[in-house]
């Protein structure tokens, strides 16, 4: 289904939070949406791998990496795992790596920046907790919508059929 965050804001501005424009798109899919699953971790991605092993249909993983860009929390292997398990997208308040491979994987990925250094594989961190970045607090079970223009958050699912067709 087509996502246009600009049109969603035109219709639902009083019902959504708009994430600060600090993210870039790195995945093979530019538009995605789904129910939020959260992780908070710092420079390690073992917990991310555990969560991405789950079925992700209709879900978007939000990773609060503290805004650190010294180590990539998402690489091609994790992105492919997410795509294979049906995840709609991943939003990382941190870095990613292996960009030429990420852009060929059928999943949406938004992150702050690329860096070639990988994360530790420790499983330190927390999941299913509120996380705050980009001027917005994300709660598990919220709904997130992302495209090349931006990222918005809603407590309830938005009616996408109300958007105009191009």
From Swiss-Prot:
InterPro entries: RraA, RraA/RraA-like, RraA/RraA-like_sf, RraA_gpbac
A Pfam family that the UniProt record links to this protein: RraA-like
SUPFAM superfamilies membership: RraA-like
Entry-linked Gene3D superfamilies: Ribonuclease E inhibitor RraA/RraA-like (3.50.30.40)
GO MF annotation: an example: enzyme binding
Coiled-coil parts of chain: none
Domain of life assignment: Bacteria
Keywords: Cytoplasm
Signal peptide, first to last residue: none
UniProt similarity note: Belongs to the RraA family.
Name of the protein this chain belongs to: Regulator of ribonuclease activity A
């Amino acid at each position: 289904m087509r996502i246009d965050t600009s049109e969603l804001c035109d219709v639902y501005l009083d019902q959504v939070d708009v994430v600060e424009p600090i993210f870039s798109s790195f995945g093979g899919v530019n538009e995605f949406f789904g129910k939020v699953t959260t992780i908070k971790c710092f420079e390690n991605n073992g917990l991310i791998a555990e969560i991405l092993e789950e079925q992700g249909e209709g879900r978007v993983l939000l990773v609060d990496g503290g805004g650190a860009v010294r180590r990539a929390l998402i690489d091609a292997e994790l992105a492919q795992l997410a795509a294979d398990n049906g995840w709609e997208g991943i939003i990382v308040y941190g870095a990613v790596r292996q960009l030429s491979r990420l852009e060929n994987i059928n999943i949406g990925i938004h992150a702050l920046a690329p860096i070639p250094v990988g994360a530790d594989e420790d499983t330190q961190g927390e999941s299913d907790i509120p996380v705050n970045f980009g001027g917005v607090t994300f709660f598990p079970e919220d709904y997130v919508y992302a495209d090349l223009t931006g990222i918005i958050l809603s407590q309830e699912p938005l009616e996408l059929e109300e958007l105009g067709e191009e």
